[in-house]
């Protein structure tokens, strides 16, 4: 909105020329989202507590988590609100990718909201059935992919990190890949959200990494130099990623250990879905497994645990899955697990960004 209102004035007042720069608008989108979460955080916590919207703890989870019962949840709505406002203020609203990312965010927010709402009604840690949730996510992800590929300049080539000459064209199968990436990321982030601030930090790191990828993909000169796929218009997604990172940092102020508020499924499902959507738009789908390596490992720990348990009729690989619960039961303090996982996320993101130059 500010871009459309103020940038046209640059012919009269040269200062407003700064609104043409994506970097400038990304910085202020990030600050806007951060301030919204930071300033509205206490009000949100009080409101959720007054409405008795508290976290229900999984009965089979670690006993140490029982003390978290009743902590205000569904705080992800605050993050989504901050991102929406920041994008409406600072993004180019004529850019189709901004609306695709916001649509993905809104769609997965709706699924997460219904899931959390049902938990509050049932008064237990059980919302939508796994089948209903997966079906809703798949339909939504397919719609998002169709929106992305509706553009005439859409590229269905898959960029393979480290190999500049390996770029298979998947054709229509790319939509299947896109659905898998979006739904998989949404659920992986949801599984990782099990400790205070555990998923918030890596999400900040992931969106900062994709700020770089979006800017590079949207710039014809830089993308050609680095030999990555140029996606016209995708540079504006940098503003969206900046808003995401800022909103998450503002939320982390209250979500850090000991958490005063949880994001709930309305947060984890929506933010994961948005991250997967950004990966598709920027043509960095494979790198998401590295940037979000922590989410991948947490998800695989659950898959291996369940598979091994069924195959061996009761034996386990880990003391408990997802992986962070395994370390809890080994006696690691919660803050230590969180910080160490953050360190791993930072290292993985740095390696991922470095692949832009390693080809």
Curated annotation (Swiss-Prot):
This protein's record includes keyword Transmembrane: yes
Compartments (UniProt record): Cell inner membrane
Entry's transmembrane regions: 21-41, 73-93, 98-118, 143-163, 166-186, 202-222, 237-257, 261-281, 286-306, 336-356
Keywords (A to Z) from UniProt: Cell cycle, Cell division, Cell inner membrane, Cell membrane, Cell shape, Cell wall biogenesis/degradation, Magnesium, Membrane, Metal-binding, Peptidoglycan synthesis, Transferase, Transmembrane, Transmembrane helix
Superkingdom to which the source organism belongs: Bacteria
Catalysis performed (reactions): UDP-N-acetyl-alpha-D-muramoyl-L-alanyl-gamma-D-glutamyl-meso-2,6-diaminopimeloyl-D-alanyl-D-alanine + di-trans,octa-cis-undecaprenyl phosphate = di-trans,octa-cis-undecaprenyl diphospho-N-acetyl-alpha-D-muramoyl-L-alanyl-D-glutamyl-meso-2,6-diaminopimeloyl-D-alanyl-D-alanine + UMP
One term under GO cellular component: plasma membrane
Enzyme superclass (EC): transferase
Family the entry assigns: Belongs to the glycosyltransferase 4 family. MraY subfamily.
UniProt protein name: Phospho-N-acetylmuramoyl-pentapeptide-transferase
PANTHER family: PHOSPHO-N-ACETYLMURAMOYL-PENTAPEPTIDE-TRANSFERASE, PHOSPHO-N-ACETYLMURAMOYL-PENTAPEPTIDE-TRANSFERASE HOMOLOG
Membrane-topology annotation of the record: Multi-pass membrane protein
Cofactor(s) recorded in Swiss-Prot or TrEMBL: Mg(2+)
Entry EC number(s): 2.7.8.13
MF GO annotations: metal ion binding; phospho-N-acetylmuramoyl-pentapeptide-transferase activity; UDP-N-acetylmuramoyl-L-alanyl-D-glutamyl-meso-2,6-diaminopimelyl-D-alanyl-D-alanine:undecaprenyl-phosphate transferase activity
PROSITE patterns: MRAY_1, MRAY_2
Location, primary (coarse class): membrane
Biochemical pathway: Cell wall biogenesis; peptidoglycan biosynthesis
């Amino acid at each position: 909105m500010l871009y459309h209102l103020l940038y046209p004035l640059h012919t009269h007042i040269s200062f407003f020329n700064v609104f043409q720069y994506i970097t400038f608008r990304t910085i202020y989108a990030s600050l806007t989202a951060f301030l919204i979460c930071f300033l509205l955080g206490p009000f949100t916590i009080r409101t959720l507590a007054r409405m008795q919207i508290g976290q229900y703890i999984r009965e089979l989870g670690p006993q140490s988590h029982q003390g978290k019962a009743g902590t205000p949840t569904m705080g992800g709505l605050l993050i989504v609100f901050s991102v929406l406002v920041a994008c409406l203020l600072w993004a180019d609203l004529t850019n189709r990718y901004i609306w695709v990312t916001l649509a993905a965010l809104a769609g997965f927010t709706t699924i997460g909201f219904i899931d959390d709402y049902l938990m509050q009604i049932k008064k237990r840690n059980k919302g939508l059935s796994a089948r209903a949730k997966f079906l809703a996510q798949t339909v939504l992800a397919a719609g998002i992919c169709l929106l992305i590929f509706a553009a005439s300049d859409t590229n269905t080539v898959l960029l393979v990190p480290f190999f500049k000459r390996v770029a298979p064209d998947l054709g229509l199968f790319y939509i299947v890949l896109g659905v898998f990436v979006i739904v998989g990321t949404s659920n992986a982030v949801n599984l990782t959200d099990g400790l205070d601030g555990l998923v918030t930090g890596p999400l900040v790191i992931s969106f900062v990494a994709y700020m770089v990828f979006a800017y590079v993909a949207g710039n014809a000169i830089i993308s050609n130099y680095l030999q990555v796929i140029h996606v016209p218009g995708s540079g504006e997604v940098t503003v969206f990623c900046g808003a995401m990172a800022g909103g998450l940092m503002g939320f982390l102020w209250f979500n850090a250990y000991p958490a005063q508020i949880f994001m709930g499924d309305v947060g984890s499902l929506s933010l994961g879905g948005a991250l997967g959507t950004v990966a598709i738009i920027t043509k960095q789908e494979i790198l998401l497994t590295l940037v979000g390596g922590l989410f991948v490992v947490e998800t695989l720990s659950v898959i291996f645990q369940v598979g091994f348990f069924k195959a061996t009729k009761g034996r386990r690989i880990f003391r408990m899955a997802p992986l962070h619960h395994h370390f809890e039961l080994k006696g690691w303090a919660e803050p230590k697990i969180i910080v160490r996982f953050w360190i791993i996320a930072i290292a993985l993101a740095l390696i991922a960004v470095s692949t832009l130059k390693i080809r």
